[in-house]
A protein has these predicted regions:
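Basic/aromatic DNA-contact patch characteristic of tyrosine site-specific recombinases
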Residues: 16
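Active-site nucleophilic cysteine motif
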Residues: 138, 150-164
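Helix-biased detector of long, well-ordered alpha-helical tracts
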Residues: 145-149
Length: 164
């Protein structure tokens, strides 16, 4: 079995033990790579590649084949069902800052990164893009609440802030 896997959800909580009742130690963002260390019922014990966190996730929302080309550069990027900036095509789903995606198709000001999932081009940049002004990045998170183990617009902690 191949041991490099990638998150296919906006983000997944990484639990200390194989239970939703246990403490969240970190989060895995869309496109983030991890290794499976152990399978336990409906849970995987994993180690994240970026920051080496170890914990448990449910056995869903992952893929083996993924080669990211771009990343999210805004606090959150709205996912559209179709490449049109109309209310009826907007979903209530977002990708958080630093998520990694693969651009599959471009249409006007939109890119497709998964089947029937589109992002506005203003929300992405090439995978190797480095923002030089860290203060601007930190200001993106200024009104985000504190969440232990968080790395997203829904809540962030001190280590999550340093990792972005």
């Amino acid at each position: 079995m191949k041991n490099n896997f990638f998150c296919k959800s906006s983000y997944i909580d990484l639990y200390e033990y194989p239970s939703y009742k246990s403490k969240v130690s970190s989060q895995i963002l869309y496109g983030e790579k991890f290794k499976i260390l152990l399978k336990k019922k409906n849970w995987f014990k994993i180690k994240t590649s970026y920051d080496s966190y170890i914990g448990y996730i449910k056995k869903t929302h992952y893929t083996e084949k993924f080669n990211p080309t771009h990343k999210i550069i805004n606090l959150k990027a709205r996912i559209f069902k179709y490449p049109k900036n109309l209310v009826k095509y907007k979903s209530n789903n977002f990708l958080p800052f630093a998520s990694k995606i693969k651009v599959l198709k471009k249409y006007k000001n939109f890119i497709m990164f998964d089947k029937n999932k589109w992002l506005h081009i203003k929300d992405i940049n090439k995978i190797n893009y480095q923002k030089k002004n860290f203060i601007k990045i930190l200001k993106l998170f200024i009104n985000c609440k504190y969440k232990w183990g968080g790395k997203t617009f829904n809540g962030i902690d001190c280590s999550g802030l340093l990792q972005i």
